[in-house]
Amino acid sequence: MKTGFGVASAVLGAVVFCHAASAESFRLAEIQPKDRHTTKYTCATGRVLQVTYWNTANGQSFALVPVKGQQLLFVNTLSASGVKYQAGSYTWWTKGPRADLYDAMNGEDAPPVLSDCVTIIR
């Protein structure tokens, strides 16, 4: 599991740079993207989030999630239910059309920082 965090830390700067340079590009020579999609969510607070997901040829998945004014690269990790992505102390946990954002710095039993984020369907 630490390897996933190491990869996320190592490529975070490159991905943020790539994202800033072009919202369409996500290029790392070592990791070949298979598909990409962007989903908009409306959270219980009324905040709207735009999250971009990548699935890669090697089976990894990434999510680019806006947190405190920055785009953070999250890497998928083991989950008993749904898909869980982690970046530093943050966890972005999706289950079907819903998602929650947690910050481990707030404590193990703390409520989500953003909760009940639901996919906007057009």
PLM ranges: what are they?
Residues G6-A8, I120:
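Short amphipathic alpha-helical "recognition" segments used for binding
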Residues C18-A20:
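N-terminal signal peptide c-region/cleavage motif recognized by signal peptidases
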Residues A10, T52, Y90-T91:
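Short, low-complexity intrinsically disordered segments
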Residues A23-L73, G107, L114-R122:
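N-terminal secretory signal peptides
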Residues M1-G4:
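Positively charged n-region of N-terminal signal peptides that target proteins for export
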Residues K68-N106:
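Mid-chain, structured segments of secreted extracytoplasmic proteins
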Residues S9-V16:
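Bacterial N-terminal signal peptides
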Residues G13, L49, F62, W93, ...:
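Amphipathic alpha-helical interaction segments
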